[in-house]
């Protein structure tokens, strides 16, 4: 079992599991004992939660603007379009991919005689993720109103790596991509009702998250849509009456709903685990910041999950 775990072909799961554990431990330090090591909170927080950190610290000096979130989605969208182009080419020419990219994909996951993701399923999943990433890019460019808040370079690099890994985690387990034993066939008829249900749920969660992004942006805009201020405020209404970070909640739901579309995926499960841990701790840290910053912050409001957490 240990030999299988540390096999070279498990490069992506090992990276994702290591990143998840490291993130969880660091965030626990930030929440429980932030003054023990000031470097850890500096590495695990960004935006409003990081504004109170010492400006002369090394991490603060090598930080980047929070508005650079758009780089995540731009590079992620480019990677997704390249993956979709490869799949489109494989439909017409099974030998389209040269040897080097195939060897690269094979070291990212377990060795399979037949990879677990069918071509039709992979196409549906990649199209859904493309929609999600394109929507997030649109929001960062035209909806969200960013202040002068910053994020550390470590967080920036992890974000870029995440959105590049996301489509690759599906490509490296798609039949006909890393092996030539299967016919690369794509058909709508191959998609099951459960997978369609997952796709609908994925879209609904994206729609809800977009509404929340607009709601957050409107707290800094006037009646005519012009930017009024860059100050942080308390959001009210809809999901904000229940939790402090509904956008983080729906981010988790988006990734979980995709599991209904690609239930046989192996690497993607580690992506989901990383996202769940990341968004949960981000919500807890943000929730704590709200309570410290606003004395009259609603006491009944939870951080992430209504009535629970």
UniProtKB/Swiss-Prot annotation:
Keywords, sorted A to Z: Endoplasmic reticulum, Membrane, NADP, Oxidoreductase, Transmembrane, Transmembrane helix
Keyword Nuclease recorded: no
EC number(s) from the headed UniProt entry: 1.3.1.94
Enzyme's top EC category: oxidoreductase
Residue spans crossing the bilayer: 12-32, 71-91, 114-134, 151-171, 248-268, 270-290
Chief localisation class: endoplasmic reticulum
One GO process term, biological-process aspect: dolichol biosynthetic process
Pathway(s) it belongs to: Protein modification; protein glycosylation
Localization terms from the record: Endoplasmic reticulum membrane
Molecular function terms from GO: polyprenal reductase activity; polyprenol reductase activity
Reaction(s) catalysed (UniProt annotation): a di-trans,poly-cis-dolichal + NADP(+) = a di-trans,poly-cis-polyprenal + NADPH + H(+)
Single GO cellular component term: endoplasmic reticulum
Keyword Nucleotide-binding assigned: no
Topology in membrane: Multi-pass membrane protein
Recorded superkingdom: Eukaryota
Function of the protein: Plays a key role in early steps of protein N-linked glycosylation by being involved in the conversion of polyprenol into dolichol. Acts as a polyprenal reductase that mediates the reduction of polyprenal into dolichal in a NADP-dependent mechanism. Dolichols are required for the synthesis of dolichol-linked monosaccharides and the oligosaccharide precursor used for N-glycosylation.
Protein name: Polyprenal reductase
């Amino acid at each position: 079992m240990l030999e299988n775990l540390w096999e070279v072909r498990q490069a992506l799961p090992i990276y994702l599991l290591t990143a998840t554990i490291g993130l969880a431990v660091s965030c626990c330090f930030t929440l429980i004992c932030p003054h023990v090591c000031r470097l850890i909170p500096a590495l695990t927080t960004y935006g409003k939660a990081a504004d109170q950190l010492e400006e002369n610290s090394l991490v603060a000096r090598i930080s980047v603007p929070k508005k650079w979130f758009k780089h995540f989605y731009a590079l992620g969208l480019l990677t997704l379009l390249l993956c979709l182009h490869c799949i489109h080419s494989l439909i017409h020419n099974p030998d389209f991919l040269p040897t080097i990219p195939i060897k690269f994909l094979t070291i990212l996951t377990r060795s399979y005689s037949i990879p677990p993701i069918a071509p039709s399923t992979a196409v549906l999943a990649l199209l859904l993720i493309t929609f999600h990433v394109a929507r997030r890019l649109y929001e960062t460019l035209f909806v969200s109103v960013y202040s002068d808040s910053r994020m550390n370079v470590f967080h920036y690099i992890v974000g870029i790596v995440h959105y590049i890994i996301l489509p690759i985690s599906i490509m490296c387990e798609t039949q006909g991509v890393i092996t030539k034993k299967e016919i690369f066939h794509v058909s709508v008829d191959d998609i099951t009702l459960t997978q369609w249900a997952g796709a609908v749920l994925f879209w609904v969660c994206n729609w809800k998250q977009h509404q929340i992004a607009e709601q957050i942006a409107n707290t800094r805009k006037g009646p005519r849509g012009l930017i009024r201020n860059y100050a942080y405020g308390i959001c009210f209404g809809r999901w904000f009456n229940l939790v402090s970070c509904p956008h983080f909640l729906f981010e988790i739901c988006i990734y979980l709903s995709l599991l209904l579309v690609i239930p046989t995926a192996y690497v993607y499960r580690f992506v989901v685990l990383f996202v769940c841990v990341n968004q949960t701790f981000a919500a807890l840290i943000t929730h704590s910041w709200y309570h410290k910053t606003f004395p009259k912050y609603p006491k009944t409001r939870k951080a992430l999950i209504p009535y629970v957490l």
